[in-house]
Amino acid sequence: MRLLLFSSALLATITCADGQQEWPIRTDVVFYEAVVADTPIKVVISEQAFDPTKHKTTEPENRGTEENPNWIGATVDGRPVIGTDQALPPKGLPQLGRIVVHFGDRQVEVPASLTSNVFLPHLHDPGVFNLRDADSIVSISADGKCVQIDLGVGDGGGTATAFFAVSADGKSTREPPRRPEP
């Protein structure tokens, strides 16, 4: 019971003396490991505390009317925010800081321009799913040269996924895979 209470306290939001909330920030989490086609694959993900002064941000705005609203969500560095209720995240909220994929001895880091708009990444239990539910899924090509990460993010009404594909040749994208047409 003490361990349960201690764990709950660690996950709780902390409020500083100045009223600013602080969240636990996890770094260098080994998110997934496997060996495919004799290549060791390791995905390492880190969070960072969001600092809006280091990004170009926009607030949500209603581009419609009061009778017929058309809300456009907040953006960070020109991309829609993922992991919040379309609102601009508060300072200190866990932001996806970096993704590094190891293909054997080669490391490929996803550019910050692809991660800066992603908040509250789910860095627990990747690859754990059942017939109905999946949080985060990692897929690796049969030749071990490409990793796809479908990362669960957010909480409550802001829950979503952020997709990343990383290849051993150093390229990264947020574009989901295309299926060949018949």
Label the model's feature ranges:
Residues 3-13:
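Sec-dependent N-terminal signal peptides
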